[in-house]
Amino acid sequence: SNSDYLLDGFPEILILSNDLKDGQPIGVVDAGVEWHSDLSWQLDPPLGSILHCLTTPTTGGRTGFLNMSAAYQLLPKSLQERLLSLEGSHCVSKLVNSRVTISENRVNAAAFYAEQLKKHPPVSHPMVYEHPDTGEKILFASPRFTIGIDGLYEEEGQSLLDEIFAYFDDETIRYDYSWSEGDIVMWDNRSVLHCALGGYQYPDIRLIHRT
């Protein structure tokens, strides 16, 4: 489990890395490869997230960010209005999300995600909320953790999510960050999605601490 990759003495820090020690990964290898907001599968997700880069690969390894206030503004007015009254269902287990794939690097993946589903059943969050500091309307949904829309039949909910997620390809709401060793990046987890963009392979190493 991810608890195997917490930094010694600092349990709030998770190690993200493809480096190996005695043939085993020292961190979560394929963390965050789908667009997501950290821990949105919890009832009270964190307000912010911080990444500290310790080792960068020679190629790739960037992190993408999406502005979810701008994403909401991209939607047609009719869709904006419809989403105001809906709640999305968020879940950490990949077993209930057809949009994601289970990494080959995850040991005993099926058992792990079955246990996660048992420990962390789906929770609901508004599809759109008003940011408490800026007053902006924020689209709060992601391909990684949003598995359905409450009150809609499965097919209708998935179709609506597909329509929303298609807007995530718009370059005007996206920024890709290229890391240098020692960089620290922090962001508002409530209004920004992020994902690891890959593009490197072992023995090219990426090592990042997340909290």
Name the predicted role of every residue range.
Residues 1-186, 190-211:
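Fe(II)/2-oxoglutarate oxygenase catalytic core
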